[in-house]
């Protein structure tokens, strides 16, 4: 079977998930990163550490419904990343249990045709929001769900679409700070007095260190 026919049979999809990885047959603390694309037979990963070609890995992909564990081999590795960026790696899957294979197929079927499908995970944490460019005090709220692309904010006041915020989430690894924009807010007619108001928030400026903290948070390591 040619490489082209394999690619056509098992396409890759731009599904973005937090991923933990460890060396196969070696007890060590896991590394962390993100998927850049994902298919039934392999993936492109953005990792904090450079991993050499031929290295066997055990991967744990965190989704909004389950963890998918896969054994894989590194088939190519990009140049060692700068401190403010990760390093891309191509991996080929070598072993996956039937129930995890089914979970992977279900994920690809549900998310595969969504452009830049960042899976949102339900995480409720306290968040402080500062309105960039306005000399006002911070607004305290709660997160509802989080992905690499953004999060759901629950705030005591309604902020208009397009509002630029700097958000800070406290984690056990330290504060996670990022800038972004409000892209939607619950209509005023749906506001319940005394209840927080939901806002969609898209990240626009997140440093690599914060992205790693975010990956660890979503992967259950914080």
Where are the predicted features?
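Structured alpha-helical
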Residues: 1-222
């Amino acid at each position: 079977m040619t490489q082209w026919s394999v690619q056509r049979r098992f396409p890759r999809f731009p599904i973005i998930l937090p991923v933990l990885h460890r060396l196969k047959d070696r007890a060590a603390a896991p590394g962390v990163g993100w998927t850049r694309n994902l298919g039934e037979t392999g993936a492109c990963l953005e990792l904090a550490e450079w991993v050499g070609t031929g290295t066997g890995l055990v991967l744990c992909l965190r989704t909004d419904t389950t963890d998918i564990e896969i054994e894989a081999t590194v088939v190519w590795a990009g140049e060692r990343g700068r401190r403010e960026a990760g390093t891309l790696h191509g991996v080929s899957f070598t072993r996956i249990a039937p129930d995890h294979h089914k979970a992977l197929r279900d994920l690809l079927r549900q998310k595969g045709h969504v452009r830049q499908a960042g899976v949102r995970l339900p995480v409720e944490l306290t968040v402080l929001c500062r309105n960039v460019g306005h000399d006002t005090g911070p607004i305290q709220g709660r997160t509802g769900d989080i992905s690499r692309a953004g999060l759901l904010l629950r705030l005591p006041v309604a902020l208009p679409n397009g509002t630029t915020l700097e958000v800070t989430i406290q984690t056990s690894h330290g504060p996670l700070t990022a800038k972004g924009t409000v892209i939607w807010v619950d209509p005023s007619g749906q506001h319940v007095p005394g209840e927080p108001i939901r806002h969609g928030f898209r990240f626009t400026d997140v440093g690599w260190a914060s992205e790693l903290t975010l990956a660890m948070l979503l992967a259950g390591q914080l």
